[in-house]
From Swiss-Prot:
Name of the protein described by the UniProt record: Protein GrpE
Keywords: Chaperone, Cytoplasm, Stress response
Biological processes per GO annotation: protein folding
Function: Participates actively in the response to hyperosmotic and heat shock by preventing the aggregation of stress-denatured proteins, in association with DnaK and GrpE. It is the nucleotide exchange factor for DnaK and may function as a thermosensor. Unfolded proteins bind initially to DnaJ; upon interaction with the DnaJ-bound protein, DnaK hydrolyzes its bound ATP, resulting in the formation of a stable complex. GrpE releases ADP from DnaK; ATP binding to DnaK triggers the release of the substrate protein, thus completing the reaction cycle.
SUPFAM superfamilies per UniProt: Coiled-coil domain of nucleotide exchange factor GrpE, Head domain of nucleotide exchange factor GrpE
GO molecular function: adenyl-nucleotide exchange factor activity; protein homodimerization activity; protein-folding chaperone binding; unfolded protein binding
PANTHER family, per the entry: GRPE PROTEIN, GRPE PROTEIN HOMOLOG, MITOCHONDRIAL
InterPro entries: GrpE (IPR000740), GrpE_coiled_coil (IPR013805), GrpE_head (IPR009012)
Pfam families tied to this protein: GrpE (PF01025)
């Protein structure tokens, strides 16, 4: 601070010779000038600090958005991939359910069932599950009602028959339909 005062005095062209005294007014002016410079420097530091904090917060938000975007892109890729597999899985299901199999075909069908099981295992690791809701309450988010029947035996809308299995992606409590199960719904009589 003494250096700033001397600098301020030099700026005011005050020359002090040895043995001379500086007036109180000159000292006050030098101190006021130094205090103004200090206040300006503090304000600039505060401004730069605020700017840095805003930039840091913006960068943190950018990182969070990017991570969410990557996660959503991954989920969407898995979903698209699973959508493409549903037809092939349906065909494997049809082959494995062929009635009146000859002994030669039985071994082949068993191999198909093993491949089918492996597909389901891989899909489940990614949170994709097969839905065959026969006997379960009807869920319009995961099922599509193709037909319905009314009966006194039903107290709520219940799946009576599954025409085509559905697939959904499960993450925590959330279930997102990939392909709805096509079902026949039993309804209570009105």
């Amino acid at each position: 601070m003494a250096e700033e005062t001397n600098q301020s005095l030099e700026d005011q062209n005050v020359q002090v010779e040895e043995g001379q005294t500086i007036s109180d007014e000159a000292i006050e002016q030098a101190v006021e000038g130094a205090e103004k410079e200090l206040d300006n420097a503090k304000k600039e530091i505060e401004s730069l600090k605020d700017s840095w904090l805003r930039e840091r917060a913006e960068f943190q938000n950018y990182k969070r958005r990017t991570a969410n975007d990557l996660l959503n892109a991954r989920k969407e890729s898995i979903k698209k991939f699973a959508e493409g597999l549903t037809g092939a899985l349906d065909n494997l299901e049809r082959v494995s359910n062929v009635p009146n199999q000859t002994p030669e075909v039985v071994a082949f069908v068993e191999g198909i069932k093993m491949v089918q099981k492996e597909f389901y295992s891989v899909l489940e690791k990614e949170g994709i599950k097969r839905l065959d809701p026969k006997g379960q309450p009807f869920d319009p988010m995961l099922m599509e009602a193709i037909a319905s029947e009314e009966s006194a035996e039903f107290t709520e809308e219940t799946v009576v028959e599954t025409y085509q299995a559905g697939y959904y992606h499960e993450e925590g409590e959330s279930k997102q339909s990939i392909r709805p199960a096509r079902v026949k719904v039993g309804k209570p009589q009105s």
